[in-house]
Amino acid sequence: MNIAIVCYSTFGGSGVVATELGVALAQKGYQIHFITYGQPVRLSAFHKNIHLHQVYVEEYPLFRYQPYELALSSKMVEVVREYNIDIIHAHYAIPHAYTAFMAKEILRKEGLEVKIIT
């Protein structure tokens, strides 16, 4: 099974829990794809079943804060298409759960179905 885990990559609790969950699932043989803006701090060792997909946000001078949500949902769509993801685990409601929903709707229009859990 191919699982995408979308999380914050910082020291905070949700990022730690999501990373530890991903590592445990990878050790059981699942293919884990972390989608985040940086390497999770608790992801310190290489594992053949763990893949990191970094979200890059382009600088655009019109915006005070760059549109991370759009870049994140686009990266989710890309990863689901390329790696045949079965489940997106969106480990935080805002912005991860609603960007996962946006990605799911884009993929549905292409005939691809992916489950989301939060």
Regions found by a protein language model. Name each.
Residues 62-87, 97-102:
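An amphipathic, basic-hydrophobic alpha-helix
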Residues 93:
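Active-site beta-loop-alpha junctions enriched in small/polar residues
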Residues 15, 41, 96-98:
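Short, well-ordered alpha-helical microsegments
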Residues 13-21:
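Conserved alpha-helical elements of sugar-nucleotide-dependent glycosyltransferases
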Residues 7-11, 23-68:
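N-terminal strand-loop element at the rim of the active site
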Residues 3, 87, 102-118:
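Active-site proximal beta-strand in glycosyltransferases
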Residues 1, 30, 50, 114-115:
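A structural micro-motif
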